[in-house]
Every structure is written in C-alpha cells, then in structure tokens.
Amino acid sequence: MQSIPIKNVGADNVSQLIDRFERQYVYLRLSVTDVCNFRCNYCLPDGYKPPSHKQQFLSVSEIQRVVRAFADLGTEKVRITGGEPTLRKDFLEIAHTVSQTNGIKKVALTTNGYRMERDIDLWQQAGITDINVSVDSLDTRQFQLITGENKLQSILKGIDRAFEIGYRKIKVNAVLMKQYTAPELDKFLVWIKDKPIQMRFIELMETGEMDSFFQAQHLSGQSVMQRLLQEGWQLQPKALSDGPAKVLSHPDYQGEIGLIMPYEKNFCASCNRLRVSALGKLHLCLFGEEGIDLRDLLSEDTQQAQLEARLKAALQGKREHHYLHIGDSGIRNNLASIGG
C-alpha cells in the first residue's frame, strides 16, 4: 500500500475524522473480547476474571456497521484486538467481514499467538494482512514465568509458518521490563538478524492495578534507543497509518526494532487511532475516561448517518495529550479490556 503524506490530508476533509488539533484518524483499534487465556505479569497476573453481570460482546453485524462507518469517514486500517481475539468462535467471520469492508486496506491482528501455529493459514484466508504477536522472552522458562503458559515453541513455529505462507513481515511485541525483557535484548537482536521481524519493545505503562510492578520494572525506551543508535541503527520515516513506534533499521539486519514510548514528549502529537471496545464504546484515548456508547446506533443499517455524526462529534472532545507523565492513567485498571 502506498503511504499517504501526513501533511496532505486531501480536499475532502469534511468527510474525514479530524480533531481540533488537526490530527487525522485513519486507524481503528477494534476490541472484540475482554477474555484472555494468558496471565501476563504486566497485565492480568491473576488471569481473566469475568464480571459478575453477563456481558454481550459486539456481534458480527454490529462490528460490520461500526467498521463501515469508520471506513466511510476515512479509516483505512483496522486492528482486531482483545483480550485475545482468536478465542472468539466467530473470529474468522469477524476478520472476513472487516476485510470485505469498502475502504479498509489493512486488517491487522494483535494476538498472544496461542492459536497461531494451528490457525495462521485460516487467518490469512479470512483477510488478515498484518500480524502482531507477543513474545516477551525467547527463553521457554522465562516465557512461562511471564505469561503463565508454556507456548513459546508453538508461537515461534507459528511465526515461521507465517513467513512460509507469504507474510513479508511479522511484528513481535515485548513489554520492556528491567528484570525480564531488558537482559534478553542481545538475544532478540540475534533472532531478527536474518528474519523480517519488527521487534517492538513497548514501555511498561502504569495502570491502576499495577503501580508497584511499574515502579519495580519500568525501563525507559530511550535507554534502548541510545544504545541502538550508537550501534549503527537508524530511525525510519513513518507513514500516516503507522502506529506510534519509532522504527530503527540496520544494514546488517533483515529485521527492525520498534520502540513504543508513551512517556516521551510529544508522543500524542501524531496520534492517528481511535478505539472501540468489545462492548461498543468509543474510546478517544487508551488512557482516557469512560467511553462513549455507540451500541444504540449499531442495530440497523439505517442508523449509519447518526453513527457517523456521533463519531465526529465525540472526536472534538479528544484531549491534546494523555497525562501519564503526572501519574494519571484515567480509569484504566489494566489494558486487556481495550486491547492496548
């Protein structure tokens, strides 16, 4: 896909999602479930606990309507997230539905990789164009310690299979932690030397349930950035639909490094994504307050104009930046409910 110049928004601005700060939103992160089967120490260390009241996640038809509205307003990329989205029995139908929406050019999946080895061929057939998979350690025992699951070797086989069936690049996520991830940096670099993997280190973010863990494990991505720059890695330009990662490449490496540093100054200046939760709420920011309900406008196709009007109106309430730097993570107790 050709990248779109960031400054040249185009003549048809009226139909686009643009906020008060001239940021254009072409990227939707769509959560389809809160449920996750991993127990990652930085997210859900005690595992997923269902709420006392029964929750009904978005149906395929509701997903179709919300994606259609976003696409009509200029969204080009949808990332399906969770929880773990592949746990839904109708996941393949969801992926196919999103991929068939007019205007959507990329359908990405964020997964813990639990079913990747088994189902990667089916994901591709359903229309998944891009995959992000979490690998917080390349050591089997350490991986199980972090995630609560002994699935590392299966996930690595799933990544290899993705390349075999034609995926040109796989993005691999690892949360940057002093005790766990940081000591394995050299091992990750060796791994991506001859593989087209974008290895993304995500700064640990402070959330309501994880304050003490954050204090013990947080490591600035800038320290990794400085080391890489000193070793000959170079920053790469970004396309409009790209995520927040600062991407570095090296002439001796087939893979890349991505650094996601939400505490960095001006992190929000290039924000290009909105979020819809599995319960049908629009979230203007990962660390914002209570979401804006869309579900009452997702039951009939005839409601699309009203839905688009609500999206555009809600966007004008988006803040210029988050307040993580002063310890305000909004109402977010963990990241599983909205897909990070």
From Swiss-Prot:
Note accompanying the cofactor annotation: Binds 2 [4Fe-4S] clusters. Binds 1 [4Fe-4S] cluster coordinated with 3 cysteines and an exchangeable S-adenosyl-L-methionine and 1 [4Fe-4S] cluster coordinated with 3 cysteines and the GTP-derived substrate.
Keywords assigned: 4Fe-4S, GTP-binding, Iron, Iron-sulfur, Lyase, Metal-binding, Molybdenum cofactor biosynthesis, Nucleotide-binding, S-adenosyl-L-methionine
Residues binding GTP: R29, R79, T110, K171, R273, L274, R275
Occurrences of domain Radical SAM core (ranges): 20-246
SMART domains to which the protein is assigned, alphabetical: Elp3
Keyword flag NAD: no
Record Gene3D superfamilies: Aldolase class I (3.20.20.70)
Coiled coil region boundaries: none
EC top class named in words: lyase
Amino acids binding S-adenosyl-L-methionine: Y42, G83, S134, M205
Assembly mode: Monomer and homodimer.
Family classification: Belongs to the radical SAM superfamily. MoaA family.
Official protein name in the record: GTP 3',8-cyclase
